[in-house]
Design a protein with these regions (language model features):
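Solvent-exposed, non-membrane alpha-helical residues enriched in polar/charged side chains
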Residues: 4, 8, 38, 42-45, ...
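Short, acidic/polar
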Residues: 31-49, 91-99
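Beta/alpha (TIM)-barrel catalytic core signal, keyed to glycine-rich beta->alpha loops juxtaposed to Asp/Glu
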Residues: 1, 6, 60-167
Length: 167
């Protein structure tokens, strides 16, 4: 809603990119269908106060979703309905990214890339460039590690995803 207020407050052209799917319960591949995803898109449209979302990304769906043509057909339906202009995916692995860009209407891929995670530069970036697919970098500061605000003694809450690096 805050972003929606910002959009209303300016005469400048603002392009909106958002993600959907992560709040599916349960979060599994079967949930990536029009009946489950469209209500999330509708809520985003309402909260943002826009008629169409410029870029809607699927937020790290289960791996099997990337090779399921129905996943992309669902997104194509949302484009046809005028609810989204373009769509992309947010991925965990290079393999998921390469699978997603096999589908012609995928316009962007959000992928982890930073000084510690360089694998996308080996193959994915080249393939994305060949297909003119936008790349959005995730976790560029390695979840805060590269900010200089953490050290070997930094402690995280028990449910903080950064704990996986400690062991």
């Amino acid at each position: 809603k805050f972003v929606g207020e910002l959009i209303k407050s300016t005469s400048e052209q603002i392009y909106v990119a958002t993600k959907t799917g992560r709040r599916l319960d349960p979060h599994n591949a079967d949930g990536y269908n029009i009946n489950q995803i469209e209500p999330f898109v509708d809520r985003s449209l309402l909260n943002l106060g826009v008629d169409c979302i410029d870029l809607m990304q699927l937020h790290c769906p289960p791996t099997e979703s990337y090779s399921n043509s129905e996943t992309y057909s669902m997104m194509d339906q949302l484009v046809e309905k005028g609810k989204i202009q373009y769509y992309g995916v947010s991925v965990e692995t290079v393999e998921e990214a390469l699978e997603a860009i096999k589908y012609p209407n995928v316009k962007s891929v959000q992928i982890i890339f930073n000084i510690f995670r360089q694998k996308p530069s080996e193959k994915f970036f080249v393939e994305a460039a060949k297909k003119n697919i936008a790349v959005i970098v995730r976790v560029p500061l390695a979840s805060g590690l590269l900010t200089g605000k953490m050290n070997i003694n930094s402690q995280f809450a028990s449910n903080d995803h950064r704990n996986y690096n400690i062991e």
